[in-house]
Amino acid sequence: VYDIGCSTGTFLKKLADRHKNKKNIKYYGIDVVKNMLKYAHKKNYSKNIKYLNKDITKFKLLKSDLIISFYTIQFIQPKKRQELLNKIYKSLNWGGALIFVEKVRSYDARTNEQISNIYEEFKIENGFTLKEIINKKKSLKGILEPFSSKANLDMLKRAGFIDMSTVGKYLSFEFFLAIK
């Protein structure tokens, strides 16, 4: 099992704990941010999880049954995303799955703006200040490049996936499942 962009390793640790009785599963958390991995080693250590400080676009994946990625592919340069999904498809065993969650762009600017406003209201209701929200928005400009739902599904199809769908959606965040 690979977790691409594992951050602090929280999800991977929960997954490993849930399946601790299955002896042949190896878990790999991959992230480019060393401090996240230091935290993962400290707070989410497990003997069957290996945390790797690697750039996924340059890392060779071993054969796997499951690859997960939460809010990571949207930060990969658009021209490299297809290559990454091709690599993921090739590394999956037959019947293996890719589960990923991404921010998606709507088909029109008006809808994007409305969803963005709803999400900002949600952040304010949860204690974020306007300054924090604006600073976060500025920090992501030019780095976070969301694609539309259709563009994400098209990339999966070009990579070779046939069985793929959106399995959940909340505002501008979409959950995709693709099975080889």
Regions found by a protein language model. Give the residues of each.
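C-terminal alpha-helical "lid/dimerization" subdomain adjacent to the S-adenosyl-L-methionine
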Residues: 103-158
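A conserved beta-strand element that flanks and buttresses the S-adenosyl-L-methionine
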Residues: 68
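Short conserved loop adjoining the S-adenosyl-L-methionine
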Residues: 58-62
